[in-house]
Amino acid sequence: MAKSIRYILKAFQEPFGGPLQIRRHVKALAESGFDARMVTDSLSDNHFYDLPVPTLLRSDFNPTQSDICVIPEGWRKEFEELGKSGATLICLCQNHFYVHLGFKRKETFATFGIDTVICCSRQVANHVERYYGVPDVQVIPCGIEMRPEVPRHKELAISFMPRKAPYQAGFIKDVFNRCYPELDGVEWIAIDAQSHSEAMRRLGRTALFLSLAHREGFGLPPIEAMSLRTLVVGFHGGGGLEYATSRNGYWLYEGELIQCAQELRSCLEMIRRGTREISDKLDQGQLTASYFDVSRMKTRLIEFWEGRV
């Protein structure tokens, strides 16, 4: 008897990359003929993602031995409750910085009967393999939508997402404004609690994206900016080591806030002059982003699930 795939989630008051990737998993699996659904406590955050997927409400979900429940890292309550149902449990780990939230001392995934862990990046997988005794972590890469056409006309403006690092955002902006009054006309465009489509529109219209990535398992915004030919300046947050190189952006250590303001100014000047260095970085960034096209994620996802249901 074929098993049902149930990705466990809950609604949040603001958008995150993790729930977006879960929706992409469910959509890809359902389109490929799998019995896959998202199980959530509410539909209240669906408007953030513009991505309808087959869904069950938690109140209507009665897990059995015929279900495979895919649970995010750190969700101890779900590990315990769903483990009692007889369902098979798999952990989808999208951020290694949160794994410890699901365990007491000396506990591991095996404590909850979990022997399979899916990770969104090699950075996350390395951590799980090394510290949690899972010998063969499965990596299913994050997927982004590569657009056939991207905005060629860019506003000389800086987009940024302050959610994880509002202090750093404010500090960098203050130093920039005080040191470079001649650039007072450069607009700073915050992307915060907007829908994914609106976030992509704002990213796409700006020449620069200030990456404030912090404690990331992968970090979607910088790679999405690259896909839109928006130049990335800032931090990779750890997980961004999956894609960040000196060829596709201007990357700094997280504490280098003043240097970040200086780099933004330098890049704006090069963009104004239309330098080859900038065009080369944009080309390389777009190429890097193409490696994470959602089709690659779907191929790996199907390979993983074909042998399990």
Where would I find each of the regions flagged by the language model?
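Aromatic "clamp/platform" in nucleotide-sugar-dependent glycosyltransferases that forms part
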Residues: 214
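N-terminal pre-catalytic "stem/leader" segment of glycosyltransferase-like enzymes
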Residues: 1-68, 238-240, 249-253, 291-295
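A charged, aromatic-enriched C-terminal amphipathic alpha-helix characteristic of glycosyltransferases
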Residues: 272-307
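Extended catalytic core of nucleotide-activated donor transferases of GT-like folds
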Residues: 43-114
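Short alpha-helical segment that forms part of, or immediately flanks, the ligand-binding pocket
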Residues: 200, 223-227, 241-242
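Conserved catalytic-core segment of nucleotide-activated headgroup transferases in glycan assembly
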Residues: 18-21, 126-131, 136-199
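Short hydrophobic beta-strand element within catalytic cores of glycosyltransferases
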Residues: 231-234
